[in-house]
């Protein structure tokens, strides 16, 4: 097989070279191909019409960034098998995403606060990695599926000697975040993500400390790292946590709350959408996603989901469900209102809820979950490491005044934490 490459508007091209061309067999699996029909931004495209790019292109982008990182001289001492394991983990890291991407994870939650409960896409990804045909493809190329799964799912145990591998895929500055910030900014038409990723890659170093490899960034790269963190913060403010998108996602949370109640009363029919029923019915009955659902899950994508909602809207005789689906499909009737304090929010919630018949389907409290500006605070091993001109090693939080003051600057006086989401009367 010759080299395989894709043209890409963000990175120029995605290349499967002589060392990695076997990984194209993973791209051709059904689990990976379905990502062509899973939008990267879920339902945000309702408000950012250009944002219809997919998990497929993003996953290829993450692979390509990792390939370029690992081909730099800094990573020359690293064993080729380790490099290929990182590349595979980057390529496959999102194959467990459901229709509507992250939004799906809250549809079956008890409360609409983006807390993962019954469906966690990282766990589903690891199920795919440890199932056929992906498992056999990896083993045939001397790649350990369990290590790949551990790199993707942070809840899985990882040897300290392999922390550097996970950092390239999941950290405050990793290939995943590099690609989605660049890609999402480009396709939504925003200008936040002016990230000099090429220089960041050149300034990365892989150094042995006490016998264990660690990732370092040269200190002259500090302004680029700070810009990267600010960019991510602004993207969450303006794109990922857009109030209209939250309202739309919670509109569908209400839809599934109503479906759940109808299922409990044996009054709901999936109208022939068998694969969707095989995945959603257990979740509606509070059963955690498991391996036996994979054959049905791999058939689901955004188009199946949308077809289901349209069919349900046209056929349902339930007035509440009809009203909720009309809002989602035709003209969004849900709004979000933010409050300065929890007490103000709760008081207004009680006042507004009294105006609704069947209020639990039309108004809810919502606690906006802010992403941390710098998550390295949570664990010393997750800190971004800086290598000074004097060849000394330090942590980003010790050298960056911006990171030191990030909570004060970005979160202590946040005005958009407490909210109500409600159907407009």
UniProtKB/Swiss-Prot annotation:
<dbReference type="GO" id="GO:0006203">
    <property type="term" value="P:dGTP catabolic process"/>
</dbReference>
<dbReference type="InterPro" id="IPR050135">
    <property type="entry name" value="dGTPase-like"/>
</dbReference>
<feature type="domain" description="HD">
    <location>
        <begin position="55"/>
        <end position="181"/>
    </location>
</feature>
<dbReference type="InterPro" id="IPR003607">
    <property type="entry name" value="HD/PDEase_dom"/>
</dbReference>
<dbReference type="GO" id="GO:0008832">
    <property type="term" value="F:dGTPase activity"/>
</dbReference>
<protein>
    <recommendedName>
        <fullName>Uncharacterized protein MG461 homolog</fullName>
    </recommendedName>
</protein>
<dbReference type="Pfam" id="PF01966">
    <property type="entry name" value="HD"/>
</dbReference>
<dbReference type="InterPro" id="IPR006674">
    <property type="entry name" value="HD_domain"/>
</dbReference>
């Amino acid at each position: 097989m010759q080299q395989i490459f894709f043209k890409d508007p963000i990175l120029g091209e995605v290349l499967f070279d002589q060392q990695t061309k076997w990984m194209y067999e993973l791209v051709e699996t059904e689990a990976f191909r379905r990502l062509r029909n899973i939008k990267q931004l879920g339902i945000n495209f309702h408000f950012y019409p250009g944002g219809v790019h997919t998990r497929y292109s993003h996953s290829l982008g993450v692979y390509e960034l990792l390939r370029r990182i690992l081909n730099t001289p800094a990573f020359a001492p690293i064993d080729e098998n380790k490099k290929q394991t990182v590349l595979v983990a980057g390529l496959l890291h999102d194959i467990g995403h459901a229709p509507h991407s992250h939004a799906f994870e809250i549809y079956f939650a008890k409360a609409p606060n983006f807390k993962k409960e019954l469906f966690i896409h990282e766990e589903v990804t690891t199920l795919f990695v440890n199932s056929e045909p992906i498992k056999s493809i990896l083993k045939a190329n001397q790649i350990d599926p369990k290590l790949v799964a551990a790199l993707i799912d942070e809840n899985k145990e990882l040897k300290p000697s392999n922390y550097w591998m996970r950092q390239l895929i999941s950290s405050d500055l990793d290939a995943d975040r590099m690609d989605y910030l660049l890609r999402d900014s480009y396709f939504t038409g925003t200008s936040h993500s002016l990230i000099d990723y090429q220089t960041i890659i050149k300034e990365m170093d892989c150094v042995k400390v006490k016998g264990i490899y660690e990732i370092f960034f040269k200190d002259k790269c500090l302004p680029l790292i700070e810009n990267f963190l600010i960019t991510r913060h602004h993207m969450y403010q303006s794109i990922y946590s857009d109030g209209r998108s939250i309202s739309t996602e919670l509109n569908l949370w209400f839809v599934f709350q109503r479906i759940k109640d109808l299922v409990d009363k044996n009054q709901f029919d999936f109208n022939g959408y068998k694969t969707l029923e095989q995945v959603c019915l257990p979740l509606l009955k509070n059963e955690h996603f498991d391996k036996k659902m994979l054959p049905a899950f791999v058939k689901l994508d955004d188009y199946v989901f949308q077809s289901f909602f349209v069919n349900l809207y046209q056929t349902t005789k339930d007035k509440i469900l009809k009203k909720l689906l009309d809002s989602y499909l035709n003209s969004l009737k849900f709004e979000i209102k933010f409050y300065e304090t929890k007490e103000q929010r709760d008081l207004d919630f009680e006042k507004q809820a009294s105006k609704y018949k069947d209020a639990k389907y039309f108004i809810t409290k919502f606690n906006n979950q802010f992403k941390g500006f710098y998550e390295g605070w949570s664990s010393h091993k997750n800190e971004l490491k800086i290598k000074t001109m004097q060849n000394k090693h330090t942590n980003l939080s010790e050298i960056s005044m911006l990171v030191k003051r990030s909570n004060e600057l970005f979160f202590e006086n946040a005005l958009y934490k407490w909210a109500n989401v409600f159907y407009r009367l």
